[in-house]
Amino acid sequence: MAHKKGASSSRNGRDSAAQRLGVKRFGGQVVKAGEILVRQRGTHFHPGVNVGRGGDDTLFATSAGTVEFGARRGRRVVNILPVDA
């Protein structure tokens, strides 16, 4: 057994908080304008119809409607289908 703790053990012992990334509103859910749909790093999902992209690649609804996930040109996209008034 070592009688010293080791060279770096006193410099360890920290961890970063999780970033809470991922899909926040799933397909078929009704959303209002401005609601966050996906939090991501990079464009894992691309913005589609009625969806905007923030500076940190967050996707958000630009109008009220129903969330739809799909594909366009081999990319995963998120669309908002408008609510029939």
UniProtKB/Swiss-Prot annotation:
BP-aspect Gene Ontology terms: translation
Record keyword Glycoprotein present: no
SUPFAM superfamilies in the record: Ribosomal L27 protein-like
Keywords: Ribonucleoprotein, Ribosomal protein
Cellular component, GO, one term: cytosolic large ribosomal subunit
Chain segments annotated as coiled-coil in the UniProt record: none
Any GO MF annotation of the entry: structural constituent of ribosome
Pfam families: Ribosomal_L27
Keyword Membrane: no
Cross-referenced NCBIfam families: L27 (TIGR00062)
UniProt similarity note: Belongs to the bacterial ribosomal protein bL27 family.
Protein name: Large ribosomal subunit protein bL27
Species, as recorded: Mycobacteroides abscessus (strain ATCC 19977 / DSM 44196 / CCUG 20993 / CIP 104536 / JCM 13569 / NCTC 13031 / TMC 1543 / L948) (Mycobacterium abscessus)
